[in-house]
Design a protein with these regions (language model features):
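Membrane-interfacial amphipathic/re-entrant helices at transmembrane-helix boundaries
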Residues: 1-19, 31, 45, 56-67
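Short, non-helical or kinked segments that cap or interrupt transmembrane helices
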Residues: 26-45, 88-101, 180, 224-238, ...
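Alpha-helical transmembrane segments within multi-pass membrane transporters and channels
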Residues: 59-106, 265
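Helix-loop-helix "hairpin" substructures at the membrane interface of multi-pass membrane proteins
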Residues: 151-228, 256
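Cytosolic-side transmembrane-helix boundaries in multi-pass membrane proteins
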Residues: 186-193, 197-200, 271-319
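Transmembrane alpha-helical segments in multi-pass inner-membrane proteins
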Residues: 213, 223-290
Length: 319
């Protein structure tokens, strides 16, 4: 049971922070299907920086890891500007823009990974190999049966994500910026009439989404494979979008959806081990979160609390 909780959290929390990014963007009124590409590009930037500076630190130093997280967030937010440019400046279809960003990220990072490995590191590889992240166990509280597993063998990024998620919740629901952002997704003309720049608020929301997606991407790179490669694009971004939809674009219910996906995945892996199934069944287990997504769509698709102006191109002159 403990291993299911430990592994489930290490999958659910990066997914959760990516979903929060999607909530920020869609609450502002901009459809965000580019989470997959943003997390991949952010992970690419973070992994490259981590490998480039690793030689300046001892093998067990956590500094490259934390710098990688920062740079992944920066990389994701910068790459998100493409989506912002297409949607806000050129008023492109937001769904198509998201798909384009995803495809561009996949192709660009695959090419640049090989190029940088050859030019910078003198290697013929299609991946950046990362160091294995250390884990943290919180003394005392980790001894509590079942609940203690939440505080056992934590990746450092799990604590970072919890802190960032709390800040994101506070900003969204307890600040004027969050109020204006939510209003942009429901009635952008009212926001404009109040003297606020709808375009600037939506730009900020898109960049926040990019930063949080990039953070989630580098966390997946460290926890799942300890490297960056094209295998980072396996649908985690779309799973984050599904989670925020099931959470009705609210942060706390979205956390519940992410935990459900995480525990379904880790529980499936544990089941394979307990039943001593062939290792090939582990690949089958990877589809459990997506099967769960389809089932939830069947039962909860009618409970849609999306922002009223989501996906609607804002025209200041139209009323």
């Amino acid at each position: 049971m403990d291993i299911v909780i430990i592994d489930g959290l290490s999958f659910a929390l990066p997914l959760f922070i990516m979903a929060i990014g999607g909530i920020y963007c869609e609450k502002s009124g901009v459809t965000m299907l580019a989470v997959e590409g943003l997390q991949g590009f952010g992970a690419f930037i973070g992994a490259f920086v981590a490998v480039a500076i690793a030689g300046n630190f001892s093998g067990d130093s956590p500094v490259p890891f934390y710098i990688a997280m920062i740079m992944a967030a920066v990389g994701g937010s910068i790459f998100a500007l493409i989506h912002a440019l297409l949607c806000l400046k050129f008023k492109a279809n937001q769904v198509i823009s998201g798909v384009v960003v995803n495809i561009l990220a996949m192709a660009l990072t695959a090419y640049l990974t090989k190029l940088l490995n050859r030019v910078v590191f003198g290697a013929t590889s299609d991946k950046f190999v990362l160091t294995v992240s250390s884990r943290i166990t919180i003394p005392g509280i980790s001894k509590i049966p079942v609940l203690g597993a939440v505080f056992t063998n934590l990746y450092p990024f799990e604590l970072v994500i919890v802190a960032v998620a709390f800040i994101a919740w506070f900003v969204m629901y307890k600040t004027r910026f969050g109020m204006h952002l939510r209003a942009c997704g429901d009635n952008p003309h009212a926001v404009d009439a109040a003297g606020r720049q709808v375009g600037q608020i939506r730009l900020a929301a898109i960049m926040i989404c990019g930063a949080l997606s990039g953070l989630g991407g580098i966390c997946f790179a460290y926890s799942i494979s300890a490297n960056f490669s094209s295998s980072i694009y396996v649908g985690y971004g779309y799973l984050a979008i599904a989670a925020l939809i099931f959470g009705n674009w609210r942060i706390l219910p979205t956390l519940g959806a992410c935990l459900l996906f995480g525990f379904a995945r880790s529980g499936g892996y544990r089941l394979v081990q307990v039943l001593q199934m062939p290792s090939s069944y582990q690949d089958l287990v990877m589809i459990l979160p997506y099967v769960l997504t389809l089932l939830l769509l069947v039962f909860f698709s009618k409970q849609n609390g999306s922002p009223r102006a989501l996906g609607v191109i804002y025209d200041k002159g139209a009323r």
